[in-house]
């Protein structure tokens, strides 16, 4: 998919000419060490970028060239985009992850910056170990929906393990955003500089930073990372997907559910994926309940795959989308533009605020004690018009306990019922009971509606004259 990627000045990328010069370019496919020139093993883009009918050695060089070309193109494109300014209205409120900000003073701007830069940003990577089932060492060009799903799950984990007002203390190197009508507008001047840990902080802050690093490490591009790309691709194989394929938002929701189920490090969190745009409360309750009825419920991430129109977004859904993004328990929306996934986390006026995964960065070795964190946090807010939003997306929510789940249900009922006044169909629905019960009820109701009533006879093969009472005309 056509996408955007990092500024070429910041991240080194190899030129296509390097692929032609290297003598090892025609070695057979298979696991091998990291590529010192920057793009990994020579089969890095086999399934994703084509040449399925080529011989056993030639695709190695061809795919390597294609991978390098695609990464270089992404670098150039992102380098152009990042130079453009993103302006925000100084008059209108901006909603980010359920919080409202008004740029009325310098303090408001700093609070917004601190909140935005604290969200985890998971992007294309290169030079990681080969993905399952092939030799791909980069997801550049095809893994954006998986990355958007990772960001949504990461936001849920931040809410699960850290206080709701937690912010990344080291991320305040952000330049203020452009404000329309501001007396002294400012521009984004590049990524925040990496700062060493603040050892003078108290024990709670240090523990939060340790947890922050642990959450980041769970998304590392390594086969052992529970929510890393390798694990997600492995789980997608049961659905017929492989590395290099396009993943839709609904499929990614189920992959995330399986990943959390199989993670031994996250025992008090479960993921529920709705069926047919319906959240069944009893199914959620059964999922989060413990054997001891008096024990606390587990926390839950609720993922709701929806379609908000035909080929394009139906504008009648925009007010409802805004209402959901204002909800504090909303994790955002995994969607984007057609064939271009983005992670929406807020809005201002008629524009969505998003994190873009199309930023091809080198893989980070998270096994180091103080691995750098700056590439996991975005410092440049971006926005997109609602009209460009792809109608196929997945909305996420988080409830930490039973009380929060009840609060969430009340809030969703209010939002969905108020929006349905102008919509023929709501975005999704909440229902009591279990999905299985509703399926059986629907089946029974269909069977209970007769289209033809045969006369009762006391003897088989006994003819009877039909009358108007023996048939039901629909």
From Swiss-Prot:
Active-site positions on this chain: 144 (nucleophile), 356, 358
Highest taxon of the lineage: Eukaryota
Tissue specificity note: Widely expressed in testis.
Keyword Protease assigned: yes
Keyword Transit peptide: no
Record's catalysed reaction(s): [protein]-C-terminal L-amino acid-glycyl-phosphatidylethanolamide + H2O = [protein]-C-terminal L-amino acid-glycine + a 1,2-diacyl-sn-glycero-3-phosphoethanolamine; [protein]-C-terminal L-amino acid-glycyl-phosphatidylserine + H2O = [protein]-C-terminal L-amino acid-glycine + a 1,2-diacyl-sn-glycero-3-phospho-L-serine
GO biological process: aggrephagy; apoptotic process; autophagosome assembly; autophagy; mitophagy; piecemeal microautophagy of the nucleus; protein delipidation; protein localization to phagophore assembly site
The record's account of how the chain is modified after translation: Cleaved by CASP3 during apoptosis which leads to increased activity. The cleavage by CASP3 reveals a cryptic mitochondrial targeting sequence immediately downstream of their canonical caspase cleavage sites which leads to mitochondrial import of the protein.
A Pfam family matched in the record: Peptidase_C54
Domain notes: The cryptic mitochondrial transit peptide is revealed after cleavage by caspase upon oxidative stress and cell death. It acts then as a functional transit peptide, and allows the import of the cleaved protein into the mitochondria.
Name of the protein in its database record: Cysteine protease ATG4D
